[in-house]
Amino acid sequence: MRFLGALLVGLLGWVGSTLAGEVGVTDKTILIGMTAPFSGSSGPYGQDMRTVIQAYFRQVNEAGGINGRKLELRALDDGYETDKAVANTRTLISADRVFALLASYGSSPTTAAMNEVFGVAKVPLVGTISGADSIRQSPKDNRNNRYMFNVRASYANETEAIVNQLVSLGFKNIAVLYQNDGFGNSGLDGVVSALKKHNQTPSAIATVERNSTDVAKAAAIIAKVNPQAVVMVTLYKATAAFVQEMRKAKQAPQFMTLSPVGADLLVQELGDEARGVGISQVMPYPWNDTVPVVREYQSVIGKQAKPSYYGLEAYVMAKVLVDAIRKSGKDLTREKLVASLEAMQNHDLGGYRVSFSPNERLGSRYVDLTVIGSGGRVLR
């Protein structure tokens, strides 16, 4: 009887705490889920993001949390593999019972997870490292998109900025290297569309498989046209391998790539050979502490990590989620969180703004062009 009584008290306490709010919400905690690569060639991207989010959550919790509740993060490694990302999302929602999702990674993984798991389960995801159109559709066109909130510009925005810059410099022989997945295909479509506006087409197109550095064939295809510029829709390992392969072939085009490459990681991989590579960015310059959101981000990470575009983007994602949870009130539910996010129109995070509405999931159109200078410094 004593055991049964203790069990009953425990069950009543558990029921009381879980009934405090939605799934993943108790009187004292809010559980947030994350799936991203923490291992493999893309592991450094996810590790940087997780470090920043954990640091920011600590800051929020030390200041009293949100309506007395502390934020907890449950982060799973997907290795930038679509099947694993989908499985992790299912685990986070069904087994771990998280309240919401934060900071995913990759176009194909996020699109599949949205359409197969979190969109169907009506669990919001705030932020992913992807500019794919598939996760930016209006909820009117795909009801699963109602639960996807992007905080960065699209690949169409990035590639248009890159192409416009190259064309303004008089370049007419522009080739494309893309990785064979959702990211690569979205970027390729963006380049083709942007060139079409200038009555141009890519002079050559070549591909590399995701998570691969086997770029010799692609470099040979592109080198044949002696391009003035190459837009590389690839991550840092493949990008570095391609640049080196092209230089071995005595090719010296203007190399351009998109924000997911990670400037710091590309510099680590290429060393001095990274000099001159242009990169489109979708966040403010993370070393410019005159921008309030950058200053906050730098303060949060302290000496735990070096400033980076990935780190700043993770901070922006986490801040958008925290702001929306605060606006949702103490009686927290997923639907209230969605409503709070949809009400964020021209929401100022401190020099960086995001906008949503019931039918808008783009979040931002901000694009900046940078170039890697001497010593691996990112220059604007």
Each predicted region: which residue ranges?
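Beta-alpha junction/loop-to-helix N-cap segments that form part of ligand/metal-binding clefts
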Residues: 21, 29-31, 44-51, 59, ...
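Extracytoplasmic "Venus flytrap"
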Residues: 23-52, 76-83, 105-106, 177-185, ...
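Solvent-exposed loop/turn segments at secondary-structure junctions
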Residues: 38-41, 78-82, 106-111, 130-135, ...
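Segments of small-molecule ligand-sensing domains
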Residues: 301-311, 322-379
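Immediate post-signal peptide segment of exported/extracytoplasmic ligand-binding proteins
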Residues: 20-34, 65-70, 166-172, 331
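Extracytoplasmic ligand/sensor domains, especially the bilobed periplasmic-binding protein
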Residues: 97-205, 254-275
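Extracellular/periplasmic periplasmic-binding protein-like sensory domains
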Residues: 243-315, 376-379
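Short, low-complexity disordered leader/linker segments with a strong preference
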Residues: 1-31
